[in-house]
């Protein structure tokens, strides 16, 4: 018996069910976490700047040499050697004698006791002479002193010799009483019409001192004493070897003839003129103004052939009194009616007067300079400054190649 084999079954054409399509799962993204707020950045401190190098020490200054003192003008006692001569001249009352006295006080040893005693006699005579001039003015203007006692005193004063009188208590009391009189005060207000010196109130204020038996005049007294220059006086100066000799000559008409005695010893001129007395008459001639006399002398001097190439130093003196007179009076325009500037401006009036002098000296040239100074001769510093400047000019111009 055989065994029978099984027949394999044929594959079935039946379709298998499709595998289920897996569902697409959408991935929902997880929300991103919100960024945490970052702390604001703190400002970082600036790195420290490197220290600047210390500046190099400044070089030590070189030691400075002490400034050399300006060359000094000195007076010379022994004036016998040759020197550059200057003629110090001008009309009367121009102040050149005061200028010379200042030179003596500042550069030399001043005045000895004998000189001062002589000045005291002069000052006392000035007091008497002044009162006489005021009394004469009253008489000329028909003004009488009303007080009978004072009128009698006035006659006594008229009879006194100013240069040779005993300055006793009786005379002093009469002078004091008259000085306080209203008529005399009125006369003094018109002193510019007379030859009365400007300084007399200074002396009347100290008349009791001046009457003292042992009184010795001060330098201020000496500078104000009025003495008409007689003769010729010389003072010699030295500036670094440059010798300059100043010859002071009298300014009154009677003294001018003596100027010829020193002409062969001088090369230049210092000419003094009082600007303050432009409206005052000459002492010698009441009909001639002092300023016109000065202009005439200046013209004559500057046109001498000897001075055709010489320096001329024009010293315009008493500028303080001139300034007050110009500011407070109409005197300038009365004397110079042709003046078209401001007659109350001292500088404008002074410039006008200076031009009048320059016109007298025309023609001008570089070889003959005319150098002007406005000064107050009573001021010693101004006189010294002027004298120094004159000496320096002479030294530079005439001794520089010596």
From Swiss-Prot:
- Where do the segments described as G2 motif lie? 221-229
Listed Pro residues bias regions: 34-69
Q: Where is the composition biased (Polar residues)?
A: 1-12
Q: Where is the composition biased (Basic and acidic residues)?
A: 23-33
Q: Where are the annotated segments for G5 motif?
A: 375-380
PROSITE patterns listed in its UniProt record: G_ALPHA
Q: Region entry G3 motif: which residue ranges?
A: 244-253
Q: Where is this region: Disordered?
A: 1-70
Record-level GO BP terms: adenylate cyclase-modulating G protein-coupled receptor signaling pathway
Which positions in this protein are listed as binding Mg(2+)?
97, 229
Which residues does GTP bind?
Answer: 93-98, 198, 223, 229, 251, 317-318, 320, 377
Record's bilayer topology term: Lipid-anchor
Cofactor requirement: Mg(2+)
User: What's the chief localization of this chain?
Assistant: cytoplasm
Q: Where is this region: G4 motif?
A: 313-320
Please provide, alphabetically and separated by semicolons, the GO molecular function terms listed in this UniProt record. G protein-coupled receptor binding; G-protein beta/gamma-subunit complex binding; GTP binding; GTPase activity
Recorded protein name is: Guanine nucleotide-binding protein subunit alpha-1
The organism is Trichomonas vaginalis
């Amino acid at each position: 018996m055989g065994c029978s084999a099984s027949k394999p079954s044929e594959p079935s054409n039946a379709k298998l069910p499709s595998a289920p399509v897996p569902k697409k799962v959408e991935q929902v993204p997880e929300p991103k976490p919100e960024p945490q707020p970052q702390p604001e950045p703190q400002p970082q401190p600036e790195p420290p700047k490197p220290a600047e190098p210390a500046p190099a020490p400044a070089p030590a200054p070189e030691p400075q040499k002490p400034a050399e003192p300006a060359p000094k003008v000195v007076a010379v006692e022994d004036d016998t050697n040759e020197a550059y001569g200057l003629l110090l001249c001008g009309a009367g009352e121009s102040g050149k004698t005061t200028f010379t006295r200042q030179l003596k006080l500042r550069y030399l040893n001043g005045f000895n006791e004998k000189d001062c005693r002589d000045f005291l006699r002069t000052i006392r005579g000035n007091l008497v002479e002044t009162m006489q001039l005021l009394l004469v003015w009253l008489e000329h203007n028909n003004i009488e002193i009303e007080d009978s006692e004072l009128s009698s005193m006035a006659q006594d004063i008229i009879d006194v010799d100013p240069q040779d009188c005993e300055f006793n208590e009786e005379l002093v009391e009469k002078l004091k009483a008259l000085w306080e009189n209203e008529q005399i005060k009125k006369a003094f207000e018109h002193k510019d019409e007379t030859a009365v010196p400007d300084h007399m109130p200074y002396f009347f204020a100290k008349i009791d001192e001046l009457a003292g038996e042992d009184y010795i005049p001060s330098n201020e007294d000496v500078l104000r004493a009025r003495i008409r220059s007689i003769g010729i006086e010389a003072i010699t100066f030295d500036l670094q070897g440059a010798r300059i000799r100043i010859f002071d000559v009298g300014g009154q008409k009677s003294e001018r003839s003596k100027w010829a005695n020193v002409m062969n010893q001088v090369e230049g001129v210092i000419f003094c003129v009082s600007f303050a007395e432009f409206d005052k008459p000459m002492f010698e001639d009441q009909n001639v103004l002092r300023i016109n006399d000065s202009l005439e002398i200046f013209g004559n001097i500057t046109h001498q052939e000897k001075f055709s190439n010489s320096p001329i130093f024009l010293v315009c003196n008493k500028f303080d009194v001139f300034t007050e007179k110009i500011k407070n009076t109409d005197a300038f325009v009365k004397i110079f009616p042709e003046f078209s500037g401001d007659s109350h401006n001292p500088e404008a009036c002074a410039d006008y007067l200076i031009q009048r002098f320059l016109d007298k000296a025309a023609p001008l040239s570089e070889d003959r300079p005319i150098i002007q100074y406005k000064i107050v001769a009573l001021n010693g510093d101004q006189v010294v400054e002027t004298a120094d400047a004159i000496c320096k000019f002479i030294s530079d111009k005439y001794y520089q190649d010596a």
